[in-house]
Design a protein with these regions (language model features):
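Short alpha-helical segments that sit at the start of domains
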Residues: 1-17
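Short amphipathic alpha-helical interaction segments
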Residues: 2, 33-50, 54-55, 66-68
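Short acidic, hydrophobic short linear motifs in intrinsically disordered regions
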Residues: 20-31
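A composition-biased, non-transmembrane "mature-region" signal
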Residues: 24-26, 41-42, 91, 95-97
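Solvent-exposed edge beta-strands and adjacent loop segments
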Residues: 58-59
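Short amphipathic alpha-helical segments that predominantly mediate membrane engagement
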Residues: 62-64
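Short, amphipathic alpha-helical interaction segments positioned at domain boundaries
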Residues: 67-97
Length: 97
């Protein structure tokens, strides 16, 4: 899958989950059949860097030293999904995740 399509699918998924987010391993599990983990993680980091989603790290509840990473769409990301913001050529928004 092209990166701009994958980014759009991830952003649509985050929009569908709003106001909650998704844990990184769950996100990877959803899309790993279509893309490799590196492309998925690069795509979600791109979305974070552009301000369309935010990344939160919390300590793992059972494994000392490990962190659990969550992603959540931002208001800027919701505006992009809803068509209330200027289109971003790096993200192709699908009708559904």
């Amino acid at each position: 899958m092209k990166n701009n399509i994958l980014r759009g699918k991830i952003l649509r998924l985050l929009s569908d989950m709003y106001p909650n987010g998704i844990e990184r391993t769950s996100l990877n599990g959803i899309y790993h059949a279509y893309d490799n983990i590196e492309d998925i993680e690069r795509s979600v980091e791109y979305l974070c860097d552009k301000g369309y989603c935010e990344k939160t790290e919390t300590p793992h509840p059972y494994k000392e030293g490990l962190k659990v990473i969550y992603y959540k769409i931002t208001p800027k990301g919701i505006d992009l999904i809803d068509g209330n913001a200027e289109a971003d050529s790096g993200i192709l928004i699908p009708l559904e995740a």
